[in-house]
Amino acid sequence: MDVKRDDALGWRVFLKGGTEPTERSALDWLHELNHLGAGEILLTSMDRDGTGDGFDLQLLELASRLPIPLIASGGAGLEIHFLEALEHGADAVLAATLFHEGILPIPRLKAYLAQNDLSVRI
């Protein structure tokens, strides 16, 4: 689910790779997906995507109130960002830019998470 902060809706849902805004609130859509039986949600903060500024922790905290497992996406730049996302409700974390650009080696991230008592597949 691609979402972007919005003054009226909190977070607005976008379609088609984030190019088409909807009138749906992300939290309303999460509730509907829960009702429909979704198994997990890939939740991407478009505002944070590619910034390296960290995941949208407020969004994760709100979304994690539902029983659907969440994969946090958008904003990772440092090892601690992954830990913060997991501490704020994400069940899994996803990143692309910092791996593709060689900013953070995956083995280093896995070691960091393991040192912080998080289960990782090494």
Question: Residues of each region from the PLM?
Answer:
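Catalytic cores of alpha/beta
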Residues: 57-95
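Conserved anion-binding
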Residues: 1-43, 47-48, 117
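Glycine/Thr-rich phosphate-binding loops of Rossmann-like dinucleotide-binding domains
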Residues: 7, 51, 103
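Surface-exposed amphipathic alpha-helices with a cationic face
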Residues: 31-34, 60-65, 110-114
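Gly/Ser/Thr-rich beta-alpha loop segments that engage phosphate groups in nucleotides
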Residues: 20, 52, 76-79, 98
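Charged helix-capping and loop-helix junction motifs
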Residues: 22-27, 53-62
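Short beta->alpha linker loops
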Residues: 47, 76-80, 104
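C-terminal helical cap(s) of enzyme catalytic domains, especially alpha/beta-barrels
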Residues: 83-122
